[in-house]
Amino acid sequence: MFSFVDLRLLLLLAATALLTHGQEEGQVEGQDEDIPPITCVQNGLRYHDRDVWKPEPCRICVCDNGKVLCDDVICDETKNCPGAEVPEGECCPVCPDGSESPTDQETTGVEGPKGDTGPRGPRGPAGPPGRDGIPGQPGLPGPPGPPGPPGPPGLGGNFAPQLSYGYDEKSTGGISVPGPMGPSGPRGLPGPPGAPGPQGFQGPPGEPGEPGASGPMGPRGPPGPPGKNGDDGEAGKPGRPGERGPPGPQGARGLPGTAGLPGMKGHRGFSGLDGAKGDAGPAGPKGEPGSPGENGAPGQMGPRGLPGERGRPGAPGPAGARGNDGATGAAGPPGPTGPAGPPGFPGAVGAKGEAGPQGPRGSEGPQGVRGEPGPPGPAGAAGPAGNPGADGQPGAKGANGAPGIAGAPGFPGARGPSGPQGPGGPPGPKGNSGEPGAPGSKGDTGAKGEPGPVGVQGPPGPAGEEGKRGARGEPGPTGLPGPPGERGGPGSRGFPGADGVAGPKGPAGERGSPGPAGPKGSPGEAGRPGEAGLPGAKGLTGSPGSPGPDGKTGPPGPAGQDGRPGPPGPPGARGQAGVMGFPGPKGAAGEPGKAGERGVPGPPGAVGPAGKDGEAGAQGPPGPAGPAGERGEQGPAGSPGFQGLPGPAGPPGEAGKPGEQGVPGDLGAPGPSGARGERGFPGERGVQGPPGPAGPRGANGAPGNDGAKGDAGAPGAPGSQGAPGLQGMPGERGAAGLPGPKGDRGDAGPKGADGSPGKDGVRGLTGPIGPPGPAGAPGDKGESGPSGPAGPTGARGAPGDRGEPGPPGPAGFAGPPGADGQPGAKGEPGDAGAKGDAGPPGPAGPAGPPGPIGNVGAPGAKGARGSAGPPGATGFPGAAGRVGPPGPSGNAGPPGPPGPAGKEGGKGPRGETGPAGRPGEVGPPGPPGPAGEKGSPGADGPAGAPGTPGPQGIAGQRGVVGLPGQRGERGFPGLPGPSGEPGKQGPSGASGERGPPGPMGPPGLAGPPGESGREGAPGAEGSPGRDGSPGAKGDRGETGPAGPPGAPGAPGAPGPVGPAGKSGDRGETGPAGPAGPVGPVGARGPAGPQGPRGDKGETGEQGDRGIKGHRGFSGLQGPPGPPGSPGEQGPSGASGPAGPRGPPGSAGAPGKDGLNGLPGPIGPPGPRGRTGDAGPVGPPGPPGPPGPPGPPSAGFDFSFLPQPPQEKAHDGGRYYRADDANVVRDRDLEVDTTLKSLSQQIENIRSPEGSRKNPARTCRDLKMCHSDWKSGEYWIDPNQGCNLDAIKVFCNMETGETCVYPTQPSVAQKNWYISKNPKDKRHVWFGESMTDGFQFEYGGQGSDPADVAIQLTFLRLMSTEASQNITYHCKNSVAYMDQQTGNLKKALLLQGSNEIEIRAEGNSRFTYSVTVDGCTSHTGAWGKTVIEYKTTKTSRLPIIDVAPLDVGAPDQEFGFDVGPVCFL
């Protein structure tokens, strides 16, 4: 029989052999790397190491290092659950609703063993709908819409010829409607030449015939009596010019001459003076950070901070000294039966048992996940007929129906293509010149243009500064539990030994039940930025870029050569609306259009009814590992595991307690003598020995040495037990005990100290997109960033929304039916139709043969959201997105005041992050930076102010004679001349195109006189002939009696107003006419443009203050963007008013030889030529002039023009006006009056008066034209155009400033604002955040704010400087300087009209000044502070809102006086 020691030795040897064998196997495995991972096979199925499965519902197996270990499932008792059910595929019954009687819930039994894995739960409900997806690409354009409804009926009117089928009193009273117009017939052949024209006017008498030949000389007769005086001889040749006479008296003032032709282009002027200093360039790039300033003076002691977070547990203290043993307690009651002891060591391997009987079939497992769809089944039998199918293709066109009633005349058709060129007709007689038409009224504003094309995606902007550090991350997953410790052998408790060396890592214990969630780890340091990702997919097309600025007007090009006659011009502007024509004939059917492009695939249809369950598919391969689940709750303790193999030697344990007294061993062999001991105590007295024999008495000797030691006596009886000895020294460390059974799981340890940051890990795959975080609190509004570089011109944007329909135009004349147009271009695909309702599922029909691919159906409506699918495989990492555009810079917080330097304290525990401090004040501006590179030249400055008028120049020479005036009115018909002979009938020539007039030929010879014809009817009016040569002098007629003066004729109907002539040169100023009567009020103008942006809404409640993030590193400055493409050429600006005349320049160098002079005046008419042959019939003339105007409506009335006094001035031009001066004299006066009135109007335009009817552009213009006028209120119209939107302003005539008043100059003085948190002082905008507050508007009472906004925009453009002041009335409210602190932290903020903030301190360009400061402390009395702001950036004024800071208490009141904004 083995002793206990031998048994232990044997077990140790066995464990060593097993370990060695395992290591050898491991080495062999390590050498053969191709051996697959450890798996197990059961029932033909292969499982991986550590896999757990249930071959039967009540049996559970695990693959452990290639062996299958199985165990029965032990079910918990189901108490208080009468209706417990065993789910399919499960072993243990469960309560159906999970409810137990409430009375039993309080009795808690002993915690049972760990239950099995529960069955897979039913599929959860569909999640809530996701957020809206990224907007899709714009859809293809829809098809053209259906034709609109017919427009309103056209105008009726005085177009009698077209409406001659109208009302007929003699008929039955109805209106006879003509039938539809037939189709146009084919073009006819050219007609024969027309009949000869009517008889021409009587020709002038022929020249006297040549004298006949002289007869023979007769004899001389007697002298006759003196004859009568002969007729006057013909005028002799003109004599030589006489000498120059003395100058005559000054003639009456002539009419202004017509404008001479424009002179040649002058020489290039000298360079102008340097322009005004340009605007400041944009702010330079941010300078390098300055060196840190010196420490400031110590601040006041801050308030006591909040208590910090609880610190981390400290390191364990040193072990205390061992306490004294306590007194022995009384014996306790007997304890409960202890748990079963640990399993024994593994027994020897038993013989293999016989196969057990087949187990019973397990209960049915739970329904599996729905399988993949099976392969398609064979075609079923033919089902019954399905529901009616969808509509078929449209049928063939039906026969024409009977013609309907003629519809209302249609709108004019689109203009057809030009027909073939017809043969030229014979030339018609020349028509009269039409009267000039009236100037058209100003057209309505055109409809808003289509939005521009979408811009091309701009290049990525420069990298923004690194953003603020993100919010604290979610807690990381809990780390894996450490390996279980080995169990030490029991011993008596020794003093703690020195720490042993850490032993090697033990094999992994069985998986423990999940522990409680560990504490939140502290965030690690930020990893290095990841490598740049692949480029992302192309983004959506960007929004359209704004149009670039207008380019400067280019120089005029040289004149081109005359071009060939151009093709026919495009259709002219739309004419006046005509009467509706008859309906045109129906056009021929157009060719079928091309097939449309294949439509886009429709969206998924509605979810159909669920199909039948498919057969179970084959087991799919294991899916990829899912993301780690959240940590489960702590499970119940599991049942004890199988006995493990002995572990390796553990580290030396602590010294055990002293063992009990052992049995005494056998006596050992005697050792060698020890060194001599110290003298012992005297032994007890020995027993008296027997007496020795008597020796002889010796002499007394010296005392001898001690004798040898006697033999030991017999052992005495054992003594009684002695008192316990002192505690011995600790024994040597015992050998390691065998590993104990697995201990219970320890409690979660305290949170460890933060580890040092790990090295950067390998770049991981891109994780799945997380759920969207909550919206952050709105940040403070940043200051406007500098304008970015202009992006390249964008591609054409999608067409904008259709504008609202304009008002229906007047109906046009009916156009002739156009010819059939070409087939239209292929239409764009139409909008997707709405999806129809899902029909009920029909019975399954037989599988038909595959039909041809049908047209793509219209996309259906978006289907309902499907239930969430199973997680897909992990995708490849998505490409990294492009760097986003830089965010707007936040407001720079002013640095806080530096605190006093404290003594170096010990490092305190980490406190919670405190709330962000208030922004400090802005520091003083730094020293000026180095000079920047020279900037590119600025845009041309505004034109300088015109110089003062120069001295009066020398009078110019008299202008050349003007071009001949317009053709005179038609004269009265002359008396019939003496009858001439009719000419011969000329042959009718072929009708040629009319050639250009040839040069005038020399006068022809006189023809023989013709016979007298009969008196012809007066012919049609010919064009007036040249003046005839003077006829032969007739006999003197007898003087007729003077006729009575004729009665004045009735005034003729006024002709239509002629077009505005080109403006003539400025006439000399006429005498001022009397003021005309006030004109009628004009019609209301069209609706103005959209009003200005409304007031901002009230500020929302203040959000919680976010935690201040770490400051990011400054990003490198991005490269400059590419230059923008040049903008389209802008429209020419309106011509400015003429400046005053400059001083005469110095005499220039002599010019080149001048061009030939103008042609001289027309010479006297030559002798009359002989009558020419009759010309061919002319082509038909152009349409005659319009008939006389209808009854007067709102006609053009010249009565508003001031009538000059009707002096009878000498009329120098009378000889050229007409043959009968008396008839025309009244007309001349009217023309002269109109001319004078026009010149007066032109004078008003060039030198406006500032009245409502004649507003100036700015007060500066008024001051320049009328320097002696006084300051006061005048009307100005900076945007020119119609004067109905002129505004009333105050003109300061000393300075030329234009001052616009606010519509409400004063704001009541009262308490406007009560703060919910009076200690939280911040600026509150009066118009934006205060109840009943408003933003300031300008323009005076009754003006339209939209008009004023436009006029102010123009006024800013024409000004270089603006200023305004505001008076703040206060009671207990600081406006600027705080008397208590001496600083400006409580000063008001102003908001300019470009929404920039104007402050009391900081950058000097954005600071205001104060002229009176009476609001520096809380005195309880009213005071005032006057604020003034002057700037060259005119877009910042006027001020539209004010934000005080020192308000909000019930006793704090304020009000404003808003001054005018003045532009210069």
Curated annotation (Swiss-Prot):
Ca(2+) binds at residues 1277, 1279-1280, 1282, 1285. Residues 198-217, 279-295, 318-331, 379-418, 448-457, 538-564, 573-592, 634-661, 696-724, 784-798, 811-838, 853-883, 912-921, 931-955, 1078-1092, 1126-1159 have a biased composition (Low complexity). Residues 23-161, 1219-1464 form a propeptide. Changing residue 1093 to C: Found in a patient with isolated osteopenia and vascular rupture; uncertain significance. Forms the fibrils of tendon, ligaments and bones. In bones the fibrils are mineralized with calcium hydroxyapatite. Changing residue 425 to S: In OI2; lethal form. Residues 1-22 form the signal peptide. Residues 1229-1464 form the Fibrillar collagen NC1 domain. A motif (Cell attachment site) lies at residues 745-747, 1093-1095. Residues 229-243, 1093-1107 have a biased composition (Basic and acidic residues). PROSITE patterns: NC1_FIB, VWFC_1, VWFC_2. Residues 1193-1218 are annotated as: Nonhelical region (C-terminal). Changing residue 1195 to C: In OI1; mild form. Changing residue 1066 to C: In OIEDS1; affects dimer formation, helix stability and organization of collagen fibrils. One of its GO terms (cellular component) is collagen-containing extracellular matrix. Changing residue 356 to C: In OI4; mild form. Residues 162-178 are annotated as: Nonhelical region (N-terminal). The modification Pyrrolidone carboxylic acid is found at residue 162. Residues 38-96 form the VWFC domain. One of its GO terms (molecular function) is metal ion binding. PANTHER family: COLLAGEN ALPHA, COLLAGEN TRIPLE HELIX REPEAT. This is Collagen alpha-1(I) chain. It comes from Homo sapiens (Human). The lineage of its organism: Eukaryota, Metazoa, Chordata, Craniata, Vertebrata.
